[in-house]
Design a protein with these regions (language model features):
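Short, well-ordered coil loops that connect the C-terminus of an alpha-helix to the N-terminus
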Residues: 96, 125-126
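Small-residue-enriched transmembrane alpha-helices
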Residues: 11-19, 117, 130
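Membrane-interfacial loop-to-helix junctions in multi-pass transporters
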Residues: 58, 127-128
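Membrane-interface coil-to-helix junctions
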Residues: 15-112, 140-155
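Membrane-embedded helix bundles of polyisoprenyl
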Residues: 106, 110-122, 128-170, 174-190
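N-terminal membrane topogenic signal
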Residues: 1-10
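Short hydrophobic "helix-edge" motifs at membrane interfaces and signal-peptide entry regions
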Residues: 2, 35, 67-68, 129-131, ...
Length: 190
């Protein structure tokens, strides 16, 4: 097994542990919403439910039944638009009351620590230092605080990806990577 695969497995395990530490058994249950207790997260769940239960509309992401009189779009809520659209595509296979918010926790923990590792390794070329340094990013109190209050704003890994683009990408590719990163961040929270 290559070092890259081992690192991905280690960060996956750490991300799963951190997600489980916060969510408990709900981490494994994509239909359990008992842990969703902040006003913002309830609003995100309600927006996802309205969007998921509605027909497909153009432009993609329209959510006219959510909101008072004027409707809304999934990109303007904290429902992680890219996930809402992807999971709506397969909603006929999903159980009732399905949500992807616990998956988002895992992704944030994984990418936060993995991208931090990549940055630190690029700067130090030392796997041990990079791993130990990335643990501080994994348990970042600011990110964890955002996760449990307003999930989409916990995508601090997007900022880290921006740093990584700047320090590691050839000049000719930077614009392309920035366009991809900004597009992705817009699909997470507008």
């Amino acid at each position: 097994m290559t070092e890259k695969k081992i690192i991905i497995i280690i960060y996956s395990i750490l991300a799963a542990y951190c997600s489980y530490f916060i969510l408990g058994n709900s981490f494994f249950l994509f239909t359990d919403n008992s842990w969703i207790n902040s006003i913002d997260m309830v609003q995100d769940l309600v927006s996802w439910n309205f969007f998921n239960d509605d027909i497909w509309r153009f432009p993609i992401g329209m959510n006219p039944n959510y909101g008072l009189d004027i409707g809304n779009s999934i990109v303007f809520t904290g429902s992680i638009a890219v996930f809402a659209i992807l999971f709506k595509l397969i909603n006929f296979t999903l159980p009732e009351n399905f949500h992807y918010f616990n998956l988002w926790f895992f992704i944030c923990f994984f990418l936060q620590s993995f991208v931090a590792y990549k940055i630190l390794y690029h700067l130090t070329k030392n796997s041990l230092y990079s791993f130990l340094g990335s643990l501080f990013f994994l348990i970042s109190p600011i990110m964890i605080g955002r996760l449990i209050m307003h999930m989409t704003l916990a995508a601090h890994w997007l900022i880290l990806l921006g740093f990584f683009i700047e320090i590691s990408s050839p000049k000719k590719n930077k614009l392309k990577y920035w366009i991809i990163l900004i597009s992705l961040s817009s699909l997470i929270h507008f």
